[in-house]
Amino acid sequence: MKVRPSVKKMCEKCKIIKRKGRVMVICENPKHKQKQG
């Protein structure tokens, strides 16, 4: 899980979602998981 000021899709399979008011990226590739914060 990467924590970044700005989250971006890193590949085609990345999905941007909002959880508890936080923007997150979920993906099949665990390296692509990101959280804004």
Curated annotation (Swiss-Prot):
- Cystines in this chain: none
One GO term in the molecular function aspect is:
structural constituent of ribosome
Q: Name one GO cellular component term.
A: ribosome
Q: Which UniProt keywords apply?
A: Ribonucleoprotein, Ribosomal protein
Supply the HAMAP family for this chain.
Ribosomal_bL36
Q: Which family does it belong to?
A: Belongs to the bacterial ribosomal protein bL36 family.
Name of the protein in its database record: Large ribosomal subunit protein bL36
What is the scientific name of the source organism?
Answer: Caldanaerobacter subterraneus subsp. tengcongensis (strain DSM 15242 / JCM 11007 / NBRC 100824 / MB4) (Thermoanaerobacter tengcongensis)
> What gene name does this entry carry?
rpmJ
